[in-house]
Curated annotation (Swiss-Prot):
This is D-specific alpha-keto acid dehydrogenase. SUPFAM superfamilies: Formate/glycerate dehydrogenase catalytic domain-like, NAD(P)-binding Rossmann-fold domains. The keyword Cell wall biogenesis/degradation applies. Pfam families: 2-Hacid_dh (PF00389), 2-Hacid_dh_C (PF02826). One of its GO terms (biological process) is response to antibiotic. Induction: By vancomycin, mediated by VanS/VanR. InterPro entries: D-isomer_2_OHA_DH_cat_dom (IPR006139), D-isomer_DH_CS (IPR029753), D-isomer_DH_CS1 (IPR029752), D-isomer_DH_NAD-bd (IPR006140), NAD(P)-bd_dom_sf (IPR036291). It catalyses: a (2R)-2-hydroxycarboxylate + NADP(+) = a 2-oxocarboxylate + NADPH + H(+); a (2R)-2-hydroxycarboxylate + NAD(+) = a 2-oxocarboxylate + NADH + H(+); (R)-lactate + NADP(+) = pyruvate + NADPH + H(+); (R)-lactate + NAD(+) = pyruvate + NADH + H(+). Belongs to the D-isomer specific 2-hydroxyacid dehydrogenase family. It is an enzyme of class 1 (oxidoreductase). Optimum pH is 5.6. One of its GO terms (molecular function) is (R)-2-hydroxyacid dehydrogenase activity. Keywords: Antibiotic resistance, Cell wall biogenesis/degradation, NAD, Oxidoreductase, Plasmid.
Length: 322
């Protein structure tokens, strides 16, 4: 096979460096575009059938049409989720969309960190210490081994989280459409009713949008914690804020947030933030917010770039044999 070309959109410098380092090993010519893909830059690298996009790129039907006209037949998204792409329109136009299933360890480790930070009141402790207030908080932390953790979704990341939870000696409940590991699977309502901590690891689609809303929160244990390292719209933020304000939930740790594209990955130090939900959550001592960074490790970067290249090569090989 001759060298193939891949157009890489929405590429940060560390990703660009990794593509430049790895592409020659696979006989690939990578064209790096810093901007997210759009109708105006769809022709930035003509004759490339394959493109790569990041999860920050919202790819609508009109952008897909521009890509199709530019000769694009394949999109590899540098993410596990594909909810930022109109996959229905892509299928209609004959454009194949694939995700990149990078190592789950980065997100699983981060999830465990958030769980521990939530149950040990780390945000309040750090805030007090930064003000030179070294008194012990009146709200004592909890021991994970005494708690029941409900894991929603047992794909690669959910399984990795369960493996880590077992080391802490806590009881684990799981809910998933497919039962892929040895764990105590229970109906979703039963998981909510019996878990001290609920952690979300399902993809975002029409079935999982607002999988946690008013009814689900009311079924959760009084004082339970909610952890989300999946996708923001898995949780109805309005209902979450209400439950935190009235004390129904004991706390939350969120690496993703509904509407995060307004502010995550941007320097907002010199401009006001209008998202009232974010501002309310940030003010709460029992809520941890981080900017969709659970995946952000050197290992995940290497995995993502290498698997993106391999995805594109596999597609090109299939095209040759058709």
């Amino acid at each position: 096979m001759n060298n193939i070309g891949i157009t890489v959109y929405g590429c940060e410098q560390d990703e660009a460096d990794a593509f430049h380092a790895l592409s020659p090993r696979f006989g690939v010519m990578a064209t790096i575009i810093n901007a997210n893909v759009s109708e105006s830059n769809a022709k930035s690298a003509p004759f490339n059938q394959c493109i790569s996009v990041g999860h920050k790129s919202e790819i609508s039907a009109s952008i897909l049409l521009a890509l199709k006209r530019a000769g694009v037949k394949y999109i590899s998204t540098r993410s596990i989720g594909c909810n930022h792409i109109d996959t229905t329109a892509a299928k209609r136009m004959g454009i194949t969309v694939d995700n990149v299933a990078y190592s789950p360890d980065s997100v699983a480790d981060y999830t465990m960190m958030l769980i521990l930070m939530a149950v040990r009141n780390v945000k309040s402790i750090v805030r007090s210490v930064e003000k030179h207030d070294f008194r012990l908080d009146s709200d004592r932390g909890k021991v994970l081994s005494d708690m029941t953790v409900g894991v929603v979704g047992t794909g690669q990341i959910g399984k990795a989280v369960i493996e880590r939870l077992r080391g802490f000696g806590c009881k684990v409940l799981a809910y998933s459409r497919s039962r892929s590991i040895e764990v105590n699977y229970v109906p979703f309502d039963e998981l909510l009713q019996n878990s001290d901590i609920v952690t979300l690891h399902v993809p975002l689609n029409t079935d999982t949008h607002y999988i946690i809303s008013h009814e689900q929160i009311q079924r959760m244990k009084q004082g339970a914690f909610l952890i989300n390292t999946g996708r923001g719209p898995l949780v109805d933020t309005y209902e979450l804020v209400k439950a935190l304000e009235n004390g129904k939930l004991g706390g939350a740790a969120l690496d993703v947030l509904e509407g995060e594209e307004e502010f995550f990955y941007s320097d907002c130090t010199q401009k006001p933030i209008d998202n009232q939900f974010l501002l309310k959550l940030q003010r709460m001592p029992n809520v941890i917010i981080t900017p969709h960074t659970a995946y952000y490790t050197e290992q995940a970067l290497r995995d993502t770039v290498e698997k993106t290249i391999k995805n594109c090569l596999d597609f090109e090989r299939r095209q040759e044999h058709e």
